[in-house]
């Protein structure tokens, strides 16, 4: 596992963004772990979070022109990613985000920041049902731009109601790559190697066996 992945897991655990235990997801599914990126909520947290996204971008070598953060959670992520890319790697990319409600005065429209043009890197925390991606694709298509890739913090690598995960459905429907800072396999490797969390291994393995893709 790359060091930035291990560091990100430690960071998420230290902020209680990532927790092991027993949790009920919105779907009603019982999960042995929970991830809530909304708890990255200080300036220091967002600065570090942006650096992890930037590290994943560098590792993937994805080619893109604009960072797009869909409302609402994607807005601070997109901003922190663009700042981290510049501060860490000297890469200066424009950033754009949308508002949920169209504004009919001032600058108007539903996009703020850079024009949505060229190859778009969409950044968000997780993909649960893929709804935010589908809404974003309407904006990207309407602006005659192209979705280069999607980058999220965590890929749970679990199927939804069908055989595919929401991420696999996005990749299939939009012919794009979905990247992540970490995925379920990284989490499994981390707890297998760390005695602090090894007690959660049986539940994690059982969960992956039942719901994994």
UniProtKB/Swiss-Prot annotation:
It comes from the Bacteria. Its cofactor is Mg(2+). It catalyses: orotidine 5'-phosphate + diphosphate = orotate + 5-phospho-alpha-D-ribose 1-diphosphate. The keyword Transferase applies. InterPro entries: OPRT, Or_phspho_trans_dom, PRibTrfase_dom, PRTase-like. It holds the Pfam family Pribosyltran. Pathway: Pyrimidine metabolism; UMP biosynthesis via de novo pathway; UMP from orotate: step 1/2. Keywords: Glycosyltransferase, Magnesium, Pyrimidine biosynthesis, Transferase. One of its GO terms (molecular function) is magnesium ion binding. 5-phospho-alpha-D-ribose 1-diphosphate binds at residues 26, 72-73, 99-100, 103, 105, 124-132. Its EC number is 2.4.2.10. Orotate binds at residues 34-35, 128, 156. GO terms for cellular component: cytoplasm. GO terms for biological process: 'de novo' pyrimidine nucleobase biosynthetic process; 'de novo' UMP biosynthetic process; pyrimidine ribonucleoside biosynthetic process. Belongs to the purine/pyrimidine phosphoribosyltransferase family. PyrE subfamily. Homodimer. Catalyzes the transfer of a ribosyl phosphate group from 5-phosphoribose 1-diphosphate to orotate, leading to the formation of orotidine monophosphate (OMP). This is Orotate phosphoribosyltransferase.
């Amino acid at each position: 596992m790359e060091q930035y992945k291990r560091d990100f897991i430690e960071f998420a655990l230290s902020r209680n963004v990532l927790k092991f235990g027993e949790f009920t997801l919105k779907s009603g599914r019982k999960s042995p772990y929970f991830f809530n990126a909304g708890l990255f909520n200080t300036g220091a947290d967002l600065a570090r979070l942006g650096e992890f996204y930037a590290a994943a971008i560098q590792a993937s070598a994805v080619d893109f022109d604009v960072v797009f953060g869909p409302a609402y959670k994607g807005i601070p992520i997109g901003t922190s990613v663009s700042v981290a890319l510049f501060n860490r790697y000297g890469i200066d990319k424009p950033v754009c985000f949308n508002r949920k409600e169209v504004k009919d005065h001032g600058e108007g429209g539903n996009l703020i920041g850079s024009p949505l043009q060229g190859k778009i890197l969409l950044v968000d925390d997780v993909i649960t049902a893929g709804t935010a991606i589908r809404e974003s694709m309407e904006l990207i298509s309407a602006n005659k731009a192209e979705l280069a890739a999607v980058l999220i913090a965590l890929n749970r690598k679990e199927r939804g109601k069908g055989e595919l995960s929401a991420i696999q459905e996005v990749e299939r429907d939009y012919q794009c790559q979905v990247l992540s800072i970490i995925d379920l396999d990284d989490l499994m490797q981390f707890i297998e190697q760390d005695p602090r969390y090894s007690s959660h291994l049986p539940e994690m393995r059982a969960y992956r066996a039942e719901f994994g893709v």
